Amino acid sequence: MRVVFMGTPEFAVPSLSEILANGHDVVRVYTQPPRKSGRGQKLTKSPVHQFADIMGIPVETPEKFRRSSAIDGLEAIDADVACVVAYGQILTSRALATPKYGCLNLHGSLLPRWRGAAPVQRAIMAGDTQTGVQIMQMAKGLDTGDILLSETVDIKDTDTAETLASRLSHVGAEMWARTLGAVEREALRPTPQTGEATYAHKIEKSEARIDWTRPAKELDCHIRGLSPFPGAWCEIGGARVKIHLAKPADGKGDAGTVINASGIIACANGCLLYTSPSPRDRQKSRMPSSA
């Protein structure tokens, strides 16, 4: 089939790779424009853009896909289907209807739970024990389309947003072969979403500051859900310390008190041992203080 692929972050690369490996003709890739990043603030292509360049696939980077010129270009491609994975742009009704079989989206949750921008992070932060990956037929609403294929994935007690996203991206990539095969055979059986919807709102930087008055288990989930970006943090001895991993530990004290130099901090009920500060942060945290 003639496939258009739309995606931007590393999460989307395995899907593009798998679609190519299954012999589909990816005629165009759409991704976000290059952005400034790193200490030198150099313009950097997205991971999907870089992979498409390696594979020799033409790439389009419209600032806003809702503009008529971008949709005109999509119509001219005459694609059978568009595969969308974390593209980061809103597709209009006209765009959704352009490919012969419409636009299919891979989403990192079991819908309708965690519709929106940050389903992986929110699932961990909420203490969910399961999530999943689904491919849906895109509709006008936010992640409201009918489900075409679904896989459940367990969330481990040690999962961070990074490790869970990596696992979901590879599970999702393997789902494209079955989905596109069903598209070719015109054998899709869409299933409407059921149940109460919850929304995975974009992660705000203000959420990264640790509130030690919360229970230890909640904070464990919160910290892992924000790892590695933006990274949870607190102040220890007047210094800002990022905490990427933590686990419940024994100890007593007022919330926010550093119990000892090994990194045990008191919470509302119980304590947390933070286990992965950077060497620089570890040096800062050795003096017992209030977090």
Label each region the model flagged.
Residues 1-39:
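N-terminal Rossmann-like dinucleotide-binding module
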Residues 2, 28, 58-77, 90-106:
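Internal alpha/beta domain cores that form substrate/cofactor-binding pockets in large enzymes
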Residues 22, 32, 81-199:
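Donor/substrate-binding cores of folate-linked one-carbon enzymes
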Residues 36-49, 53:
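N-terminal beta-loop-helix "entrance" segment that forms/cooperates
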Residues 41-46, 62-69, 84:
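Core alpha/beta nucleotide-donor-binding catalytic domains of modification enzymes
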Residues 201-214:
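Acyl-group handling in specialized metabolite and lipid biosynthesis
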Residues 213-276, 280-282:
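An anion-binding loop in the catalytic cleft
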Residues 279-281, 285-291:
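Positively charged, low-complexity/disordered segments
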